[in-house]
Amino acid sequence: MTAQPPDSALLSVENLHTRFRTSEGPVHAVEGVSVTVDEGEIVGLVGESGSGKSVTARSIVGLQDPGEIVRGSIHLDGVAVTDATDRQLRRLRGDTVSMVFQDPTETLNPVFDIGEQIAESLKVHDQLDSQSLLEYLHVPPFSSRSEWREYRERAIELMAQVGIANPEDRVDAYPHELSGGLRQRAGMAIALASDPDLLIADEPTTALDVTTQAQLLERLRRRNAQRGTAILLITHDLGVVADICDRVVVMYAGEVMETGPTDRILESPRHPYTKALLECLPQRVDRGSRLPTIEGSVPEPTGDRTGCSFAPRCDRATDACRDGEIPTVDLGDDRGTVTCGESSALESHAARSGTATSDGAPESGSATTGSAPGGGPDRSTSPLVELEGVSRRYSLANGPIERLLGTDDTLRAVDDVDLEIRAGETLALVGESGCGKSTLASLLTGLETPTTGTVRIDGTPVGTAADRDAETLADVGVVFQDPRSSLNPRLTVERAIGEPLRSNGWDRSRRRERVQELLERVGLADRHATSYPHELSGGQVQRVAIARAIALDPSVVVLDEPVSALDASVQSRLLNVLADLQADLDLTYLFISHDLTVVEHIADRVAVMYLGELMEVGPADRVFDCPTHPYTRALLEAIPSLDPGGSTGTSLEGDRPSPVDPPGGCVFRNRCPMAEPKCAETDPDQRQFGPVRAKCHIVHE
């Protein structure tokens, strides 16, 4: 065991360099990173994708393979990780540090139930000193039924601690039987089973809706307060950082650009990159106005580097920035450090005066997006899309006898929805995961058929995609949440975009001309036409998906979580592209999202969904400024404030009821802080409150 430096913290990373060997040369994923985390401290690690955040975290716990640490040191609770034996590393991972991964499937084994996996982690922690490697890998680790029962009870207690409701009913569930939020909590329970001194959480909230995110952050905050667990939180969501972190480390291209207390970073960022990141956030821009962007992209981590890696994207860069040695300056008074050769970086600046710029005015001349208050574009009063009494139910019968006897269970995915989308507007559909948003979108696109009710596009009733003619099919474009999974990896960008054109009889020369036009519209170069999906960044792949969706000039485009997994800088570009396309082509958007800050910026109207029903529908400014339904209010209160000293996101307690067995009366009553006896007795009607329609007994004008 290597002695810890006298001034070290619980975690001390000094001048870390991690590289990957490839056939095209070494990839410099991490270049000279230094990070510390004190006992009981919560530190945020932020930056765009490709900045080296996850590789840094994996290097800390010795999971950097196939990469290698070529320089620097990592001290974790007195152990030099870079010099540790396999046994020492196992002890560290089982006792001192644990990791929560962005994708819980990296932690959860699909063939074992949740309780057994948590119990096994508890057992491994209890027997660290006596276990050999073979014993450590032995499954199952329990020698008797009584021992298994003991650890099972402890697993149930741990599940309750991370916020899994009714853990006794879920301890025997398999990962595929849990929602995304519950799987993430199960992964956290496994990580906390060893009672670690340091918890590394890698993008734990990226795919979660706002209320589940608030609940997860509250559990982390509570663990930190009650057990003194230090946390290294990796995220690209600066709202999450403002909510929970004591300090922030800003990374770019494998290097640390700036460090400091969270309040100072948010109020007075010093590095041009930090300022630009903050400027790209919708919360920092007037509703409906054009979002600033950061020109360019994170450089490829190959080849030799000179000067500041951010210089090619920085409008303040000098020749010294591009070619010289960049100093890291301590700001003093515990205000952190900044690595920048530009002298003004050492001076105090407001967070809104950085280097992010407009990415150019839209071709149509419009400088706004969505419904800027008091100045949005005129919208047609006649609806382009109508859903009248639409429901979608799924039979959960186990066999033909249940169907014959009518004793099968029914899942109510969408329940009696009335909704209109006017031509040229953006209607945002929001709500927690599992509320029926994507099913409603599938009913509009024809991927699903309503059990009852009617879907009309431009006044014409439409059925499934198989029943629609070519013209009706072309009326609706779709951008899926995961664009990579919707694109054939064997097709070039040109062929992927041209596929719907080919299906509609376009010849090759006409297709090629149209693809070039579409690439230009979504901001991609001609050279991207010959690229494959795996050769593109996340933002570029999403642009390809958008180009494909509008290839046949649809009147309405369904956007299912189009920017949820993107960094702030890439997200702002995509939102500007969508605004430009809408202005140029008079597109109508159904925008599905769990990111309410994005919805507030882009939407003309908002529809709030819960357990298959619409709780509230109204103009975006009215819904966000003065929510009518208690559920809408709860969603908005769950958004963490980006302003230092602002309120933290308030979690909505309790689990959503099952759509197989929804509660009688109002479906939200068991989680509603304002519920009255009549809420349990009768289902409320949809009522009009000025421009807003809401489904609630207790709301008054």
Predicted regions and their residues:
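ABC transporter nucleotide-binding domains
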Residues: M1-E267, S344-D625, E637, R671, ...
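Charged, flexible cofactor/metal-binding loops and thiol motifs
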Residues: D7, S23, T262-L384, A397, ...
